[in-house]
Design a protein with these regions (language model features):
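Long, charge-dense accessory insertions within large macromolecular proteins
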Residues: 1-19
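Ferredoxin-type iron-sulfur electron-transfer modules in oxidoreductases and energy-metabolism complexes
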Residues: 329-355, 364, 370-394
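Activity-critical C-terminal alpha-helical subdomain
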Residues: 190, 194, 291, 295-349
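Generic recognition of well-ordered alpha-helical segments
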Residues: 41, 75, 266, 304-307, ...
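Secondary-structure capping and boundary motifs in well-ordered enzyme cores
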Residues: 38, 212, 234-241, 256-259, ...
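Alpha-helix capping/hinge segments and adjacent helical runs
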Residues: 275-281, 314-318
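Hydrophobic, well-ordered secondary-structure elements that form the walls
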Residues: 245, 283, 313
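C-terminal substrate-recognition/cap domain of FAD-linked oxidoreductases
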Residues: 12, 20-28, 32-262, 270-278, ...
Length: 394
């Protein structure tokens, strides 16, 4: 029971949800909570009722810049400890953006930093090495303007112990802080849009315990670079120890597949073996992490998960291969191709734009044709399949 509680003291959706077994005695409550995050492996959910959290009326945000990712992580750990007189966390959000994330959106502070590094104007930073700059988009919320100002003052006092690249400046003006959050929300499609044509944009989702964040974050960045993913980025919910990292991967040769396999094995070693973290923090185990569920949880917990699966789905009909997969190499098989579009000369300009699409679906909320005919993403998916069939001769 203590092991289960410890694993869920941070975000964790690796495997089935075991927390209900230590939180509830009522079988109905256990079953209902088991369904959350089961990814269709136990049952089909036709309807869900969600409760929303309180929306604080007063908010302020600041984009904090640090010269190293380790210093940024230390600041996050310190801010995590801030609480007000009622016991509420002072900082409600801290989103980390590494140098590649900032570069992908042409962040003006990053461009300034890059210029100073290039001209050797920053003491202690190697000329031309802009890889250290890291931003932490920090948010605080309150019920009154006075409470908001108290929160800002507490955070500013906390940050005096750390070296920032530019002075700390909070803003409570929506027209200003909305620009910060637009940068954050645009990272995934922006990084994906810079990938080499024909490669696949992959995003993973891990979590560390907050006390391990400074060392673990720096080691994660070094690990990804060591495998040659020079266009990769790390960003995400640092306040929860939860990061996403994006890599642009080719699967066109066996050597590239092997490079990806080696990366995932080293990620497993870093996250699980060294820091006892979560290989999947919030977006589901799927097939890519299915081979590592037992490694993260251990034999006893994995057997308990399989016993639950057999109770609900003894014939293995529901979402086969997801979460539970007997093939230890299922994550390096059956890759979804993203072929370059084959179009007429007149439509070549269109194909160059469409080839950048990573099929994230973020465009569909603004798509004028979605729901009437095909959405823009569906059109690109179909065009890619047509191109694949033409290229393969099928």
């Amino acid at each position: 029971a203590e092991r289960i509680r410890y694993k869920y003291s941070i975000k964790n959706v690796t495997g089935l949800n075991l927390l209900p077994f230590v939180r509830f005695d009522d079988p109905f409550e256990i079953i209902a909570h088991l369904m959350v995050g089961s990814e269709g492996t136990l049952a089909f959910l036709s309807e869900v009722t969600m409760k929303t959290e309180y929306d604080y009326p007063y908010k302020a945000s600041a984009m904090l810049y640090f010269k190293t990712i380790k210093e940024a992580s230390r600041a996050v750990v310190a801010m995590k400890k801030l609480v007000d007189e009622t016991g509420e966390w002072t900082v409600k959000g801290a989103e980390m953006l590494d140098y590649k994330s900032l570069s992908s959106v042409n962040d003006p502070v990053f461009l300034k930093y890059k210029g100073e590094v290039a001209s050797s104007a920053l003491p202690g930073v190697e000329p031309g090495d802009e890889t250290g700059l890291t931003a932490v988009l920090t948010e605080t919320k309150a019920r009154t303007p006075e409470e908001l100002q108290q929160n800002i003052s507490a955070i500013e006092a906390c940050l005096q112990a750390f070296t920032t690249y530019i002075p700390v400046r909070f803003t409570d003006r929506p027209e200003e802080y909305s620009k910060y959050w637009a940068i954050r929300s645009g990272i995934f499609p922006s990084v994906g849009g810079t990938r080499q044509p024909g490669t696949t944009c992959l995003i993973e989702d891990i979590a560390f315990h907050i006390e391990d964040l400074p060392e673990a974050t720096a080691e994660l960045q070094q690990l990804i670079a060591r495998h040659g993913y020079n266009d990769a980025c790390i960003y995400g919910h640092a306040l929860e120890g939860n990061y996403h990292f994006i890599i642009n991967q080719s699967f066109s040769t066996q050597a590239e597949v092997k490079r990806y396999e080696d990366l995932m094995n080293d990620i497993k070693t870093l996250v699980v073996d060294k820091y006892d973290g979560s290989l999947k923090a919030e977006h589901g185990t799927g097939r890519n992490m299915a081979p590592f569920v037992c490694h993260e949880w251990g034999d006893d917990a994995y057997k308990a998960m399989k016993a639950v699966k057999e109770l609900f789905d003894p014939q293995g009909l529901l979402n086969p291969g997801v979460i539970f997969n007997d093939d230890p190499q299922c994550h390096i098989k059956n890759f979804k191709p993203l072929p370059l579009l084959v179009m007429s000369d007149k439509r070549q300009a269109t194909s160059l734009v469409a080839d950048k699409c990573i099929e994230c679906g973020f465009c569909e909320v603004n798509c004028l044709s979605c729901g009437f005919t095909l959405s823009s993403r569906q059109r690109i998916v179909l065009q890619r399949e047509i191109s694949r069939l033409k290229q393969s001769g099928e």
